[in-house]
Amino acid sequence: MAVPKRKTSPSKRGMRRSADALKAPTYVEDKNSGELRRPHHIDLKSGMYRGRQVLEAKE
């Protein structure tokens, strides 16, 4: 069984745990419709992505 040679310092333990926290999702305002959407995602209401029509708009 593996056993650590040294005690993990509180600083190292905290740095390891810093990635475990849940982060709130980010949203950006869509330029065309003004709706909130996730960055780098298609606006599902208008079907636009980066100024191009990639899906048919939902009614």
From Swiss-Prot:
Record GO cellular component, one term: large ribosomal subunit
GO molecular function: structural constituent of ribosome
Keyword Ribosomal protein: yes
One GO biological process term: translation
Region: Disordered, residue numbers: 1-59
SUPFAM superfamilies in alphabetical order: Zn-binding ribosomal proteins (SSF57829)
Regions of compositional bias (Basic residues) in chain numbering: 1-16
InterPro entries for this protein: Ribosomal_bL32, Ribosomal_bL32_bact, Ribosomal_zn-bd
Keywords associated with the record: Ribonucleoprotein, Ribosomal protein
Basic and acidic residues bias locations: 28-44
Cited HAMAP family: Ribosomal_bL32
Family: Belongs to the bacterial ribosomal protein bL32 family.
UniProt name for this protein: Large ribosomal subunit protein bL32
Organism per entry: Brucella anthropi (strain ATCC 49188 / DSM 6882 / CCUG 24695 / JCM 21032 / LMG 3331 / NBRC 15819 / NCTC 12168 / Alc 37)
